[in-house]
């Protein structure tokens, strides 16, 4: 199969996973979706198979992406999910239908924004930056429109996935991969801490709704 066709198919998969995150109320589905998204993103530079993977940093980043987002993060979230005994995001601030419509609008807006950015030439794919922007916006939507702390952690992961995708678009030598690796390690620490926090919160309270947790007092 043509390399760039495979690359674009991975981008289509990324778009579909974003849409699924916006419409799914089942937390198990969201965790599995963001894990699949992370594994697919790790394949993007490997599919290109030329200068971007020529550096040790690029290969290391892809391997780290698969291990953390495909195994470690889901394990942490599933463990906390079992303890909290929650299954669904019942009452989001914004309905799933409206979230989907906003997501579709941001996908189209991404093409307009990408056309105005000073990106490296030639572009790897005309769809790469718009999809990266869409993925970042999906993460932000999950962060601000969902009540459950679990879903907000998933939104944080989706946001980082968008940053990673944008890094693939601008990477032309080894240095951008080092920046991305640093971001990924920061995300690992953040998700680890969030997982522990959710674990302890669920033991002390009968909910993990972020809007109620903001009202806690000494």
What are the roles of these predicted feature ranges?
Residues 1-218:
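Alpha-helical transmembrane segments of multi-pass membrane proteins predominantly involved
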